[in-house]
Amino acid sequence: MAKMMMLQQHQPSFSLLTSSLSDFNGAKLHLQVQYKRKVHQPKGALYVSASSEKKILIMGGTRFIGLFLSRILVKEGHQVTLFTRGKSPIAKQLPGESDQDFADFSSKILHLKGDRKDYDFVKSSLSAEGFDVVYDINGREAEEVEPILEALPKLEQYIYCSSAGVYLKSDILPHCEEDAVDPKSRHKGKLETESLLQSKGVNWTSIRPVYIYGPLNYNPVEEWFFHRLKAGRPIPVPNSGIQISQLGHVKDLATAFLNVLGNEKASREIFNISGEKYVTFDGLAKACAKAGGFPEPEIVHYNPKEFDFGKKKAFPFRDQHFFASVEKAKHVLGWKPEFDLVEGLTDSYNLDFGRGTFRKEADFTTDDMILSKKLVLQ
């Protein structure tokens, strides 16, 4: 099959105290993480190298994280190319984005069309372009990264989107960057990629988000709650509902990705990125209701072991405590999230679900199974 390299320029077509826990009812548990060296930097400071614009490649960039990251990078004056299969438009207006901002972005963003699993094409096309920096947003396996490194021997920095899902389940939380990882995790490919980057001696940085939310989220995180709130239905929550989790806004994640660009302190380092506060499952249901202007919801607790849901997922979060410290990113990078949880959920609701847009249709099949059994754990 003939391979084509397309580099196109598109024209316009048309946002709990530090490491704290909150159950949304005001109770807070402080879990401080100490660092020997504290670096004080002004809020919002960026550490981009003195040399002006960078020629940046984003692997992916048309689904969620890359949509916001690419705009920040373009506004900072960098030449940005998205490497995608071309199944989604490279330039589409974001909710809340002004016509002028969209026009500016569309006139500057570039596109390299191809399949990253076609390694020969990746090597030939990237070698011809000679990028300074790679942001790998959609990489899952180490074998997908090696051809990129081979094609770009003079690469200045490889910035990788990993996952906090790589950590080994533990009774001691929050997860910190030096914690044990799980080689059997479903994210083991990301662990192997981090190991590959380290072994190749390149200048790399890895970002480990927890749960990401925000407008255009393709994972049913906040959307799952919004569907039920809009329908006036009870919210089924597994077990006690006091399981502690953590969400980070996509715009704060994009800012963290920018903060590591050209930053010597980020060289060969891993950073957890998410919100500063932790939240219980019950608290998250209440926060989503507040964000969308809904009444406080009825929460129904159930025992998942009493049901056979088949392949359907009855709840969008892992049924366990799962949260990570972002202290390293705050102290080393000078990064700080802009959004608290309710503010971020409000931003997501107003710019997405509240406008009648969502990624997946509501499916209350598992809810009905739970509610019909009326099994409530006190």
Swiss-Prot record:
Q: What induces it?
A: Expressed with a circadian rhythm showing a peak during the end of the day (under long day conditions). Repressed during senescence and upon water stress. Accumulates at wounding sites. Altered expression of both oscillator and output genes.
Query: Subcellular location, in the record's words?
Result: Plastid, Chloroplast, Plastoglobule; Plastid, Chloroplast; Cytoplasm
The source's domain of life comes to Eukaryota
Intrachain disulfide bonds: none
**What SUPFAM superfamilies does the entry give?**
NAD(P)-binding Rossmann-fold domains (SSF51735)
Query: Where, per the database record, does this protein carry Phosphoserine?
Result: S240
Q: For this UniProt entry, what is the primary localization, expressed as one broad class?
A: plastid
UniProt keywords (A-Z) are: Carbohydrate metabolism, Chloroplast, Cytoplasm, DNA-binding, Phosphoprotein, Plastid, Polysaccharide degradation, RNA-binding, rRNA processing, rRNA-binding, Transit peptide
The record's listing under InterPro entries reads: Epimerase_deHydtase, NAD(P)-bd_dom_sf
| MF GO annotations | DNA binding; heteropolysaccharide binding; mRNA binding; RNA binding; rRNA binding
Which segment is the transit peptide?
1-50
Deletion phenotype, per the entry, is: Small and pale plants, with altered chloroplast morphology (anarchic membrane organization) and reduced photosynthetic performance associated with a reduction in CSP41A levels. Altered monosaccharide pattern of heteroglycans. Lethal when associated with CSP41A disruption. Reduced transcript levels of photosynthesis genes. Defects in embryo development. The csp41b-2 prin2-2 double mutant is embryo lethal.
Return one Gene Ontology term, BP aspect: chloroplast organization
Q: In which tissues is it expressed?
A: Highly expressed in seedlings, particularly in photosynthetically active organs. Mostly expressed in young and mature leaves, and, to a lower extent, in flowers. Low expression in etiolated seedlings compared to green seedlings.
What Pfam family is a match for this entry?
A: Epimerase
Mention any one GO cellular component term assigned to this protein in its UniProt record: peroxisome
Signal peptide feature range: none
**UniProt-listed PANTHER family:** CHLOROPLAST STEM-LOOP BINDING PROTEIN OF 41 KDA B, CHLOROPLASTIC, UDP-GLUCOSE 4-EPIMERASE
Job description of the protein: Binds and cleaves RNA, particularly in stem-loops. Associates with pre-ribosomal particles in chloroplasts, and participates in chloroplast ribosomal RNA metabolism, probably during the final steps of 23S rRNA maturation. May enhance transcription by the plastid-encoded polymerase and translation in plastid via the stabilization of ribosome assembly intermediates. Required for chloroplast integrity. Involved in the regulation of the circadian system. Involved in the regulation of heteroglycans and monosaccharide mobilization.
Q: Which family does it belong to?
A: Belongs to the NAD(P)-dependent epimerase/dehydratase family.
Q: What is this protein called?
A: Chloroplast stem-loop binding protein of 41 kDa b, chloroplastic
Q: Which organism is it from?
A: Arabidopsis thaliana
State the gene name recorded for this protein: CSP41B
